């Protein structure tokens, strides 16, 4: 069995911009580095990148924007999520040109994660 502290983080990013394969690969690598900030290893990280999404904030469509969900088994330390948020905002701005004030991130912890016919 895997230890709860390390198993199965998931990052799902919905972005308004197109993600060509080369940018997907760079973003995937950076997300792999980012997850280590909250003590999770890339070797258990699942990533879902969804491009060309319509995102709205305050009733207005975002030309460039991102909504990112970080899901973990257990809980992530709040001080570490602050650090990860700063890092992710830098990543989405530098790779995709999405302004940091248009990157929205939520963190979700669960005590139950299913895989391979059973739950952890």
Model features per residue range: what roles?
Residues 8-120:
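Interaction-mediating elements
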Residues 1-7:
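Short, Lys/Arg-enriched N-terminal segments with co-localized hydrophobic residues
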